[in-house]
Amino acid sequence: MKCIVGLGNIGKRFEQTRHNIGFEVIDFMLEQNRFSLDKQKFKGAYTIERLAGEKVMFIEPMTMMNLSGEAVAPLMKYYDIDIEDLIVLYDDLDLPQGEIRLRQKGSAGGHNGMKSIIQMLGTDQFKRIRIGVDRPSNGMAIVDYVLQKFSNQEMETMNKVIEHSARAIEAYIESNRFDRVMNEYNGEIK
């Protein structure tokens, strides 16, 4: 079973913020396929569905961002999900807005949600989709910037990014070839 995790903070006030872009991709995929997060366990909201003939678990941690591993690790253990079947979607300040980067593995890169998952799983050897949100250009504090809602103009770009990220996940589920999907989907979304 594949496990797709979107990172974000719970609560209405965090919707459509830079830090919640992982949730936005999961929500988009759920809506497109008429699925819903109908289960809760181990601090995570989740569902298990069939997509492209594969069993897939979608997870949104119900913790704050920096405790995301407390939801992901126990759910993966409970359902006996292999680390190679995990993909985590999250915001990345080091990528320009409108760009995604798929990676087979890597460090947390300063992202506290990823730090928590890596710590709880005991490895950084899992797939991820980094979604560019850019860095603040006006000297704004990082914490304020990532918790700020996207402007309407930014949201137009991010809606394309959300859809592109969802297509990348679907392409991986269909092909089971992450290397090919990386080659096709990495980069700027036009």
Curated annotation (Swiss-Prot):
Entry GO terms, CC: cytoplasm
Range of residues in the leader sequence: none
KW Translocase (keyword) present: no
First-listed, main subcellular location of the protein, grouped into a coarse class: cytoplasm
Catalytic activity field: an N-acyl-L-alpha-aminoacyl-tRNA + H2O = an N-acyl-L-amino acid + a tRNA + H(+)
Keyword Hydrolase: yes
EC number(s) stated in the UniProt entry for this protein: 3.1.1.29
UniProt binding sites for tRNA: 14, 64, 66, 112
Positions of the catalytic residues: 19
CDD domains the record matches: PTH
Sorted UniProt keywords: Cytoplasm, Hydrolase, RNA-binding, tRNA-binding
Stabilizes the basic form of H active site to accept a proton, annotated site positions: 91
Location of the protein in the cell: Cytoplasm
GO-annotated biological processes: protein quality control for misfolded or incompletely synthesized proteins; rescue of stalled ribosome
Pfam families: Pept_tRNA_hydro
Class of enzymatic activity (EC top level): hydrolase
Highest taxon, organism lineage: Bacteria
Subunit structure as annotated in this protein's UniProt entry: Monomer.
Protein role: Hydrolyzes ribosome-free peptidyl-tRNAs (with 1 or more amino acids incorporated), which drop off the ribosome during protein synthesis, or as a result of ribosome stalling. Catalyzes the release of premature peptidyl moieties from peptidyl-tRNA molecules trapped in stalled 50S ribosomal subunits, and thus maintains levels of free tRNAs and 50S ribosomes.
UniProt xrefs under NCBIfam families: pth
Name of the protein described by the UniProt record: Peptidyl-tRNA hydrolase
Annotated source species: Staphylococcus saprophyticus subsp. saprophyticus (strain ATCC 15305 / DSM 20229 / NCIMB 8711 / NCTC 7292 / S-41)
Underlying gene: pth
